[in-house]
Amino acid sequence: MIRDVSGSYRRALQATVEHYSGWLPAPACIDALKGEGRWNNDWDASLELLRRHGTSLPARHDLIDVFSNFYFGGDPDGDPGAWTGYISDEPLRVQRDFFTALDQNGWGWGFVSGAEPPSARFVLQQRLELVNPPLIAMGDAPDKPDPTGLVQLSDRLLPHRSGGVVAYLGDTVADVQTVLNARTQRPDRQWISLAVSPPHLLPGSQERSAYEQQLKSAGADLILPSTEAAIQWSKGSQGADSQGHSASIR
């Protein structure tokens, strides 16, 4: 939600599938798969597209190596300055002042990301220059839509172990379903699903309208026109809950 991954993670997914099958899945094909709400992990999404295409499946660890080579173009745990992969092509969707504004509006914030920790830390700490941002990344909790990571983050951000308001901003059906599952797991809190279309779906296009309808049908409470629109929403949603507010971002 804070970076455009259409030219990085999604491109690595496409390239990985093409590497094994010779078939390059179209962006709409990936959107449709993500719309099922089950394929938040791009390694698993790559394997699923290969399975549906009828390609013999590689070992998962081999596919992960291929995917990581496309995405990082170097050792994920090494010097980011040496990375030559698609990660270098990730336009930011927000700047540091986005988080300052959330602070000013009375919202604590953190991140629940399906990205590998080196990727998440790179964008948060080096590109956005955030200092030790609260983060649940891949491997820290089960993959979404399991709500464990979101619940854990809310426990860190809210001043009380029960109660409070949590808004989660995401751009996939899995993100929306994570909020719905959190409501079941922790009914003592108010959980709000804010959703936004990924930037490769242009405003006014039929594809974007269809995608937003998927998010609504999945249970999103509000569709925002952009990530930055969350600032105005958070200003209008300040309030009265003395037990605190937490904004979690994909």
Show where each model-derived region lies.
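Active-site neighborhood of HAD-like aspartate-dependent phosphohydrolases
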Residues: 1-31, 44
